[in-house]
Amino acid sequence: MAKTALLVMDVQRAIVSRFDSDPAYLSRLGRAIAHARAGDVTVGYVAVGFRAGHPEVSPANPTFGPMIGTDAFTAADPGAEIHPSVAPAPGDPVFTKKRVGAFSGTDLDLALRSSGITDLVLTGISTSGCVLTTVRQAFDLDYRLTVLSDGCRDADDEVHRVLTTAVFPRQATVLTVAEWTSA
């Protein structure tokens, strides 16, 4: 029997604050989390985070390099906190990544395999960032994948649409939160 984990990726205060065009997003994501908790689905969180001074970041990295010299996504940054509307429950695993994909710089794969998890349900911000990268990484690691299309957000609605309708279906089942929670 397959064991499943719902991954909530990069739903951190600073990131959520940039995506306020869909006020129902967090409540929809909360419904997915509640559905997982009510079933036999592990809920895991992935968050971007660095040590003070960002020693893990190369100045050549166009995404993370500009953070060097700031407190961005360190323990001193309140914006690095997972949004309280969808915060982890006691015992939920939280994986801190150092790059875009959920597997980069984490022990996520080891933890999933050690728990016998074979199926992943992916949510998060952004569709063209952590979700896309994690779909590719997880597919290459032979996980069975589901992406909750409205459990993901992107700054570009057209990019989100193309990814969830034309790209992800090649490697994952794509469902809405309502479809997943009613299955």
Where do the protein language model's features map onto the residues?
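Active-site-adjacent betaalpha module
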Residues: 1-5, 31-39, 64-183
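Acidic-leg catalytic submotif of subtilisin-like serine proteases
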Residues: 5-12
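Active-site loop/turn elements of alpha/beta-hydrolase fold enzymes
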Residues: 11, 48-50, 150
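Short acidic, Gly/Ser-rich segments with clustered Asp/Glu that frequently serve as metal-coordination loops
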Residues: 12-18
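…and closely analogous acidic/polar surface helices at protein-protein or active-site interfaces
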Residues: 19-36
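Von Willebrand factor
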Residues: 36-55
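Short, flexible, mixed-charge acidic loops at enzyme active sites
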Residues: 56-63
